[in-house]
Amino acid sequence: MLSWEFPPRTVGGIAPHLFNLSRELVKLGVEVHIVTCDFPGAPETEVVNGAHVLRVDSYKTPSPDFATWDSLMNVNMQKETAALISSLDCQFDVIHAHDWLVANAAVGLKHVFRIPLVATIHSTEVGRRNGLHTDYERMIHQTENWLAHESWRIVCCSQYMFGQVRWAFGLPEDRMTVIPNGVDVSIYQKEFDRAEFRKRFATPEEKIVLFVGRLVYEKGVQTLISAIPKILSRVNAKFVVVGDGGMRDSLTRQVGNMRLAQKVMFTGFLDEDSLRKLYQIADVCVVPSLYEPFGITALEAMAAKTPLVASNTGGLSEIVEHDNTGTKVFPGNVDSVAWGVTRVLLDPGYANWIKLNAYQKVLQVYDWAKIAKQTKEFYEQVLKVYDAGSWKPT
């Protein structure tokens, strides 16, 4: 598996996806090697839950832009992975690339070693940007398109992404499959002093409204911030915003201009243990995304038995059933978000109903063991075609 992020480097949803998927694949007897980017303090090589992890130099010398840095990182990733493949007694069966950031290395390795390449497209640039407006965005789109067409098969995390990838890259349906993301329910079952931990974020009288995600436009946090006055007019609440990103300064100014600094806490990134606990003490988790290929934050809230308010968009629409496993609101609509949050906070019976239903859905559909089994079967389908063809080296 090739990915630019893997714990402790966690930028988005790919890192936890690989961490959990690799663990469960190992349990099924799959030998997993993960090649990823280095991170301060993390060892160059280690075994994590049975998966072999190799971290390659990310070229920390100054680069003119992120794309140049990524290209340099891919050069080293391809070189180090090639050395790894050559040093092993056994041949890798499949190369699994995760998103465009590792496309150059993945495609190069595919052709050098004649190993089938598959890719998980976690999101698309045209979806993230609501179109392609700059040369930089078009470059990313073209790289995604190249990776998609070089791959034997494509994995999408939702039916929504299946449709978007097919539309964006013109792929036939028989080269694509849907395997959802998952969540580890067990981490939300550890006991801790909830009252003591809660003091870090709110007073006993305040309800906790939680947002977790990158502070970028498509995640819709600006909609939630704008809805705060309407929510506070009916409920005494504290808004905890977990994550970082390019919009943090503007959001902080927005909160200051609204004179709500005492009601909004920007935590930045939190360690996994603190985030797990925060999900469990929150009274509601809000996922107000404008664009969302899947919505791992929604799954985490459901696994923690936290009532969920989510935008009716993208993959979220498949995860959340309105009035059953959560409350759906219109994306980008301040009044709708305020209504959804207020409804959950003012009706404890309703909140309890949706959170328990959501938890059961997680157990039935989004268990990592089931997802790993689907992934292994997907690999076996690819290998069956590969073994029957003429591309395999003799």
Regions found by a protein language model. Name each.
Residues 203-213, 221-265, 273-274:
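A conserved nucleotide-sugar
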Residues 322-323, 327-334, 343-349:
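Conserved acidic donor-binding segment of nucleotide-sugar-dependent glycosyltransferases
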Residues 307-310, 320:
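Short hydrophobic beta-strand element within catalytic cores of glycosyltransferases
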Residues 290:
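Aromatic "clamp/platform" in nucleotide-sugar-dependent glycosyltransferases that forms part
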Residues 343, 350-364, 374-377:
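A short, well-ordered alpha-helix in the C-terminal region of glycosyltransferases
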Residues 1-52, 387, 391-394:
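N-terminal subdomain of nucleotide-sugar transferases
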Residues 38, 160, 182:
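Carbohydrate-associated surface elements
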Residues 269-270, 277-282:
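Short alpha-helical donor nucleotide-sugar binding micro-motif in glycosyltransferases
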